[in-house]
């Protein structure tokens, strides 16, 4: 199911941890609605501006999966309102700054390795 031109439901719910541990990470309809809004308002506009693929490393997480990966008990991933991402062709700091200046968000976290600063 396409959520936008460049993002599918499958990529927003896929998890190797869920697959490995046989965790059903199927979202409810309200969560799918949230994921669609996330894609329409943040991820697709970001993709359009950057002009290159964005890799979602973590999107929706059901409660069992969220606990398994050590997510916060109030994580927005539980509601389909968060996505962790990388953009292999771009500098992480530049992506962060673009989101910060141009896109709507509730929380924006900049997680990096020492070499990414």
Can you describe what each PLM-predicted range is?
Residues 1-47:
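Extracytoplasmic cell-surface/polysaccharide-interacting catalytic and binding patches
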Residues 54-57, 82-86:
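Structural recognition of the beta-strand scaffold that forms the well-ordered cores
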């Amino acid at each position: 199911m396409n959520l936008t031109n460049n993002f599918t439901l499958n990529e927003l719910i896929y998890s190797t941890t869920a697959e490995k541990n046989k965790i059903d990470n199927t979202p409810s309809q309200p969560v799918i609605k949230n994921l669609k809004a996330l894609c329409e308002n943040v991820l697709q506009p970001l993709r359009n501006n950057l002009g290159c693929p964005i890799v979602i490393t973590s999107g929706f997480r059901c409660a069992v999966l969220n606990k398994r990966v050590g997510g916060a008990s109030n994580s927005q991933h539980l509601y389909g309102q968060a996505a962790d991402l990388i953009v292999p062709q771009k500098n992480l700091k530049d992506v962060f700054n673009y989101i910060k200046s141009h896109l709507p968000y509730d929380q924006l976290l900049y997680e990096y390795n020492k070499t990414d600063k």
